[in-house]
Structure formats: C-alpha cells, structure tokens
Amino acid sequence: MKQAAYGLVLYIFLMLPPVTALAESIMAIHMHMQMPLFVIAGMLMTPFFQKKFPNLFSKWNSNGIPGIILFMIIVLYWMLPRTMDEALTIPAVEIFKFVSLPFLAGVPLRDSWKKLETRVKNIIYISLSAIFGFMAWLYIASPNQLCNNYLIVEQKTLGWGFVFLAACIFIYFIQTLFIDETEYE
Amino acid sequence: MEALKNTILEKTNKSLGVNAEDARLTLTYLSLAFIVLFIGGALGLLQGLNRAGLLELPVWLNYYQILTAHGVLLVLVFTTLFMIGYFYASLSHTLGGLLPKVRKMGWVAFGLLVTGVVFVVTTIIMGEASVMYTFYPPMQASPWFYIGLVFLVAGLWVSGIGVFINAASWKKRNRGKHLPLLSYFAVGAFVLTLLGSLGVTAEVLMLIPWAFGWTETINVMLSRTLFWSFGHTIVNVWYLVAVSAWYVTVPKIIGGRLFSDTLARLVVILSVVLNVPGGFHHQIIDPGFTQGLKFMHVFMSLSIALPSLMTAFFMFAVFERAGRKKGAKGLLGWFKKLPWNDVRFLAPMIAMIAFIPAGAGGIAQTNNQLNQVVHNSLWVVGHFHLTLGTTVVLTFFGVMYWLIPYLTKREMTTKINRLGIIQTIVWAVGMLFMSGAMHWVGVLGSPRRTSYTTYGDNATALGWDPYLFFLAIGGSLLFLGVILMVYIVFNLMFFAPKGNTAFPIAEPEDNASVTPRWTERWGLWVIVAIAVISMGYVIPLVDLILNAPPGSPPFKTW
C-alpha cells in the first residue's frame, strides 16, 4: 500500500500548476516525461484499486487482454499531435489527460501485464516499437508544424526522442529472446 | 562435463587461494598504476609550486603541459589501471578464478591501455597536446593524442566485456544464486563505464578528422556536451569502485556484517541508471542551453546524491552494529570501538569522512546560482581533489594493504601498518591544506587552469598569494604521501614476509532478508539507463546539432 501512497504523491505533484507549466513548455518533456510519469503514477496506485475492487478486475480483465487494449487505445490517442495541442488550449482535455493516463493506461497496464501470455507481450513490444518508430519518422521528417503550440525544432527533438524510445523497447524485446532468465534460476 | 570441470576448478581455486596467473595480471596492473601515480604526483608537485609563485618552469616543459599530463595520468590512467586490476582480482576471488579467455582479454586490455598512454604522453611531452585532460575544442591537439584516447577507451571496453563474460558464465554454472556482491559491483561499474564512454567515443571520432585537417570546423558545444556525458560518469565509476570496497570489505575488517545486500545492489543499480545525464551540470554556465533545460538538469544531477546518501546510511549502520557487538554503549559509544589503528580501516574511513564535505560541495555546485560564483575558479579543482583525490584515492590505498599481500601470498607487518597510518595522515593533512586553500581562494576569485600570474601586481590577485602558499605546502605533503605509498606498495609486493592474507568479504547478517530477483535483471536496468540518458540528452543534442553555429576552426593557444 506504500506504493499507492507514493503514486498518489507523484500524481498530485505532476498536477501542480508550476510543474505542469514547466513540463508542458518543452514538447519532448510534455510527451516523454510528463505523460509517462502519469502512467507510472497510475501503475503505482494499482494495488489500491486491485484491493478495493477485486471483482472488477477479475471480471473484466481476467486474461489481461481488455486491459492492454485499453492501455494501447489511450497511449495511441495521446500520441496524436492534435491531442497535445488540445491539452494545452482546452482545460477539459487537460483534465482528461490527468485522468486517462494514470487510470485508463497505468492501472490497466500493471493489472494486465502479469496475466498476459509471452506471445501477447511480444506483440505489444513489437507494435509499440513499430508505432514509436513511425512517430519518430513523422515528427522528424514532417516539413510542417504539427502542433500549433510547438516549434518545428521541438518537433524534431521529439522525433529523436521517439527513436530512442523505440530502440529501448526493441532492444529489450530482443534481449528477452536471447537471454532466457530460467537459465539462471 | 564442462560444468563439472568448471566446478572442480572453482573449488580448487577457493581452497588453494589465489590463482597465480590471475594474480600476475592484477599485480601488473597495480604496479603500473603506482608508477603512474608517482609520475603524476611529481607533476602535481611542480604545478603546486608554480601556482604559488615559488618555481619557474622551463619553456620546454611548461605549466600547461604538466597540467595536462597530471590530469590525464591521474584522473584517467591511474584510476583505470587500478579499477581493472582490482575488479579482475575480485572476480577471480569471488567467482573462483578468471576464465582463460577473460584473462587473455585482461592482457589485451592492458596492451591497449599502455599503447594509448604512450601516444597521449608522447604528444603532451612534445608540446603538441597542452589541451588539459578535458581536451575541449576549439583547442586542438595532435591527432595522435586523440588516437591515444581511442586506445584507452578500447582498453576499457575489452576489460568490461571480459567482466560480463565471466559473470554470465558463473551465473550459468550457479543457477538461482545471486552474483557475489563484489562481482556485482564490477558488472555495475563496467556497465556504467560503457554507457558513459559512448558520448566521448562519438566526440573523439569527430575530433580525429578535424585534427588531421580533413574537416575544417568543429561543433564546440556538441563536443563539450558529449565529453561531459563521459567525464562526469567516469568520475562516478571511480567512486563506485571505491564504494564497492566500503560495502564489501570494510565491514569484514571492522568485525561487522553486511548490513543489507539488497540495499547495496540497489545503490549499484541507481548509480548506473541515474548517472550519465548528471554530466550536464558541468556545463551549467555554458551558453546555448535554455534556463528551463538547465533547471530540469539540476534534478537529474541531484538524483545522484540519493545513492550516495543511501551509502552513508548503510555505512553508519554497519559501524554502529559492529561497535555495539563489541560492547559499545550510549548513542556514539560505537565510534570508539572502531579499529582506528588498523590502516585497512583508517584509510577508507578518512575517505568516507572526506566525502561528507566533498558531496556537499558537489550538491552546491550543481545549483545554477552557486555554480556561477565558483565555476572557473580553483574551488572546482579543490572539489575534485576532495572527491577523487581523497575519497576515491584513499580508498584505493586502503585496498592495497590487503590486496597486494593476498595476491603475493605475503603478510602486512606492523611496521608497514604504522607507516600506512602515517601515510594516511600525511595525505589527509596535505589535502586539508591543498584542497582547503583551493576552495577558499576559489571563492576569492582565483582562476583554475591558469599558471601563476599576479595580473600586473593587481591587489586582488596579490591577495590570493597566502592561500596559494598553503596550496603549495599541501601539494608538497601530498607528494610525500605519494612517495610513502609507492614504497609501501612495492614493499608489500616484493619484501613483506611470506604468509597468508585473506580477501576480506563481509558475511550477511544472520537474519538477513532474501535479496530479490529483480536485482539481477541487468537487461532491464540497461534499458532504463538508456531511456534516462535519452531523457537527459536528446533535447540538448538535437538542439546543438540542428541549430548549430558554423563551427570553429582549430586554435593552438600554447
């Protein structure tokens, strides 16, 4: 339960106005630091919800598939350039960001991950690195400004951030194929 | 069959003590390390005397040549040689001998390092590479200086890969067991070295064609940023090497136990994951970065203080428990029960005490405003003589008193112990004078990286003189310390009486909790480290490359 408390503290910290203002002032930090931290805050708070609503999770997320699909939908939604713009200009969308990333992406991700089969996990690794790779190409190669609120150079920076993220996920996936943890157990 | 053979080898090794071939490898590294320390120390003395205005250096060996050689030899070469020698001995002891292939890699790495040192030192002596150990462009050294650096980095890589191979092979032979803590430190330190060296490798590969004249200009800010992703990390690698001795050997020497295996491993993981972006605070007054970015980086830099504070907590817990076991009473009674007259404890203990002001000074420098006050002053030099020159180096010295007798099957005599205590005190007092004076005169404005000058008898500059005398006195004491230490090392190596010295490895507490499995998941931690590095560096690097100025032609300022 300590974890849940830490998650809550992180969650509140991230929503403090000076913190959001600073995090959202740089495009790459907005998408690659603030948003993942919201997901992490949600993951930390997951044990609290699992304890409070055990039936909800066992009934609706017995094999982890619904949860991971929900996670993917939320993540994909927040990757669209337009949603970032709207989060900055429309308060309701900003609130939706604060709610959706921790509770509709972080919580289902942690609840689902242990329940998933290796095959499904591999699909997630591959699709996430492929999507991130595509986003990298989009943000680096686009000659136009994709977000009204951020300059083209920031857009390119974000694209390079995506290159690294895609590489991280892909390298991790590859090492799971080659390094069999059970060999060391 | 192979596994059986290895198990038998391992058992024989444990009962017979050190493997002679492994010992020869480590002793070769350590001998060269202390020869390098002697040369580097002598250069340091010359510098200190020059800085105080007491010694005029000849034209053919000027202050900046000596400064560059002193920095490269002590910050890069001495420490690297010590680290590889010490960790290879640790692997040999805790994993039951080095694999023949790994031992060979150790020798190859040694060859690469020596080649690198020859290139670097020759160009410095020829007066073609007075660029200091940070080799900032647009100052341009001879291309062979940079090629020497490539050899040095290649030596680090080969030795690191050797460590990984040995550790992985042990894990396969010992399923379900955790890698022994000291080897775990070795793996962590080399993972960090490899991650940290990526940036500097990219930098040097840009500098070489520029130094040959194949490219006309160089991106100065990009080079500095790539350098510090390495420079800061490598200092923390040396610190991690020293810390490994604190965690694993010091508790045994004081008759205590390992306080928490999990905490020690967590410190290694955090050091690896958080370290590389910390380098940015060395550039806190560089132009070309926005204030917001610098502010973000303050957090990344300060996060490194977290594992250091955990270490402080761990060590105090070990001391208190060991003291209470020996019957200490009251809040601080354990303090008196520590073996102050044992140099194997005294040297690392003073190293740890020095890290209290050293770490605090580091935290101060990480802050933008405070950094502005001291950035290009001698304060910074004082700071890294405390962290590296005291905390790290005194721990390395402390290790020598048991590692060399262990490797040579000899024993430390009470005479050497006494001499060691004198050496430690001389070093501590010398550093107190030198580093203390550097800190103080730095705040008064005396610049770093500058040979002695009174700026045309300017009153302010003349006001620095008394402090610079203290600097010279400290420097002289430190050179005395170097002479004593080199004598001790070679005495222990060749003249100490034959006998048996144990490799001190602390046992866990009787009621120790089980170390969780996640500590062994290096695949995950390396990925997290890469993610954190990209969080720290993607924004500034893309900006520096896409919005690059025209670039700078080379300058030879000496």
Q: Where do the PLM segments sit?
A:
Chain A
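Alpha-helical membrane segments of multi-pass proteins
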Residues: 1-185
